[in-house]
Structures are given as C-alpha cells and as structure tokens.
C-alpha cells in the first residue's frame, strides 16, 4: 500500500485528489496538510513527509516548485497539480532531480481522461486530414471572486488556470506546433489578471485554436474538429468535475457518464450522433500506482507538462509583442 500525503485541501485537494485517491485500492491517504479540519490533518510539511511515500502537491501555484523539490530531496514520489510550475527553469530542475533520485514525478493533467476528449481522440482518424481544431472552455463569471488566482503574480490568471488543460490536450493530438499567435486580455471591469485568451497553434495546413472567456453566457462548442472527410462537434463540459463537487463517489457506475452526444457530419452532409466516451479521472492515480509499484510509465510525463509551460510563455510573448512567433523563437525561452 502506498501512503499518500496531500498538500492543500482547497478545490483541487478536496474535490479532485482526495476522492480519486480513496477509490484507488493501492493508495492510502495517510496525511493532509491543511488549515481545515480533517481526520488525517498534520501540523507541518515535515510531518507529512514522514508519513508519506507519495506526496501530492495541490497548493497554490507558486508553492508547487519548493514543495515538490523538498519532497523529491526526501526521496518521495511526487504528483504536482497543474500548472506544473510557474516557469521553465523550475520544471527543468524538478525533472532533473526526479531522475537523479529515481523517483516518480508526474503532473495532474486529468483532462486527458475527459470523456469528450477521449471521444474526439477516437474520432480524429475518421475525419481525414484535420485542418481546423477548436477547443473552448468558456464561463460566465462577470463578478471577480476573491482568491489567489485573481491577484497579480506568477501563476495567476486564466491562462495558467485553464490554458494548461487545453494546451496539453492539443499536444497529445498534434505534437508541438511550428508557430503560435496569441491574444491575452483582462476584459472584466476591475480585473487585475487576464480572464480571456485566444491561442492559435500553427502546423502546416492545420490550425489549432484554443480559447477561453470569462464573459461567455452562451458557451461555444467544447470541441469542433473539421477535416477533409467531415466534422465533429461536441457541446458541454465533461461532467466529472461537477460530479465530484456534488460528492459523487468516483466508483459509482454513473460517474463520468456524459449523456450529451457529439455530432459527426459526413462529406455528403449527413449527420450522425455519437455517444460520448465515459470519462475516467481515476485512471490517472491507477497509473501513478503502477509507475511506483511496477515501474510502468508515468500517466503524464513531466516533460509534456514542461512543453505546455513553454507554449504559455510563448503565448504571453506573442500577445505582448502583437505578433506570431515561430516555434524556434522558443530557444531563448527554454533556457
């Protein structure tokens, strides 16, 4: 049994990590570092390290690097919530440290196991040459909530919050782009950090458009894929987050089931509805356990997460300079 120490018990720790850890039969939640009441609460990070084999970092973004570094130095396996770190140098240091310590290091890119993404991934080869991929994550939050994500600083803003998910999904399907163009804005009155982004990743004839808005009362399609053999469009977010917020046990048969179907349009104009694959976030922690106990590949390679950070850096540069950046421009950022 792998003893797990959970650092942070806010939205990520309480809603996502704890329920998924509890239903994985090879993991045991042994310690939780939080100011909230919890039966596994410990008084310090040091106490948590003493009781843990695997440390899950679900604290605010700027804490990810120092906490993950300390855990790896103490020969603990580490899961880091997204974003992996707030800069590339930190990501490089953690990856190198994990290699030296021969410890498992992975990043919680749970959206790889969204049912709608799995459906889009499955249908992709049937669309011929895909020429346009659009992914949207829209919300309607005209009022600014209090919290560290809304305060200027490294790791704040919607590009650091939702951007890693959309970018990671795109990289899983298409790999690194040849160029990027980005628009990143703070649109809400009184907003201190960005709450809107529009990224275009360029690949030969393919364009990948990743967009998020906080002022979208009527959301755009979650996915829209258009190719030489037809299109696939799916509305609505994967239900697992809302199910977890509602307290549903991830082991329940209805967990991850999305009744909203996608629409496949053929070359002849005929349409066909497609059932959405069942989402399965618990697969991430099953993969973590297999990596620790059996030497299996980690469910998310931290180098993949680093690639996403690189694109976020390039997106900010592109937006600030008002121009598209060829991917070789990343060389100065990657150091």
Regions found by a protein language model. Give the residues of each.
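C-terminal helix-rich "cap/oligomerization" subdomain common to oxidoreductases
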Residues: 54-57, 103, 283, 287-335
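A short helix->loop->beta-strand "cap" motif at the edges of active sites that frequently abuts
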Residues: 74-76, 101-103, 203
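N-terminal Rossmann-like dinucleotide-binding module
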Residues: 1-39
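Hydrophobic residues in well-ordered beta-strands that form the structural core
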Residues: 57, 80, 105-107, 134, ...
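Basic phosphate/pyrophosphate-binding loop/patch that engages nucleotide-derived ligands
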Residues: 96-104, 118-132, 227, 231
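Beta-loop-alpha module in the N-terminal Rossmann-like domain of NAD(P)-dependent dehydrogenases
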Residues: 40-97
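Contiguous beta-strand/loop segments that form the cofactor/metal-binding neighborhood of enzyme cores
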Residues: 168-248, 282-296, 332-335
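Predominantly a Rossmann-like dinucleotide-binding segment in NAD(P)-dependent oxidoreductases
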Residues: 111-183, 187-190, 322
């Amino acid at each position: 049994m792998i003893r797990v120490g959970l650092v942070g018990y806010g939205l990520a720790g309480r809603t996502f990590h704890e329920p998924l850890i509890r239903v994985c039969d090879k993991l045991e939640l042994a310690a939780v570092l939080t100011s909230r009441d919890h039966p596994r609460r410990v008084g310090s990070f040091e106490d948590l390290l003493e009781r843990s084999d695997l440390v899950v970092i679900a604290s605010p973004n700027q804490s990810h690097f120092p906490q993950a570094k300390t855990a790896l130095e103490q020969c603990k396996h580490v899961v880091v919530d997204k974003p992996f770190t707030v800069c590339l140098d930190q990501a490089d240091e953690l990856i190198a440290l994990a290699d030296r310590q021969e410890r498992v290091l992975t990043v919680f890119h749970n959206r790889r196991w969204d049912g709608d993404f799995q459906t889009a991934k499955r249908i992709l080869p049937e669309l011929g040459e895909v020429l346009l991929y659009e992914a949207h994550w829209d919300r309607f939050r005209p009022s600014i909530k209090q919290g560290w994500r809304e305060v200027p600083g490294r790791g704040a803003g919607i590009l650091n919050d939702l951007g890693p998910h959309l970018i990671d999904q795109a990289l899983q399907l298409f790999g690194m782009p040849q160029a990027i163009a980005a628009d990143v804005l703070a649109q809400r009155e009184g907003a201190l950090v960005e709450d809107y982004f529009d990224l275009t990743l360029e690949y030969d004839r393919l364009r990948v458009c990743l967009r998020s808005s906080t002022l979208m009362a009527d959301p755009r399609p979650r996915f829209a894929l258009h190719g030489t053999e037809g299109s696939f469009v799916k509305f609505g977010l994967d239900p697992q987050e809302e199910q977890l917020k509602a307290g549903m046990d991830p082991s329940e048969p209805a967990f991850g089931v999305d009744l909203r179907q996608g629409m496949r349009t053929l070359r002849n104009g005929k349409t066909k509805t497609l059932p959405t694959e069942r989402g399965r976030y618990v697969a991430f922690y099953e993969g973590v356990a297999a990596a620790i106990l059996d030497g299996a590949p980690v469910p998310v390679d931290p180098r993949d997460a680093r690639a996403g950070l690189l694109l976020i850096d390039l997106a900010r540069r592109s937006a600030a300079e008002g121009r598209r950046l060829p991917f070789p421009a990343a060389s100065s950022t990657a150091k």
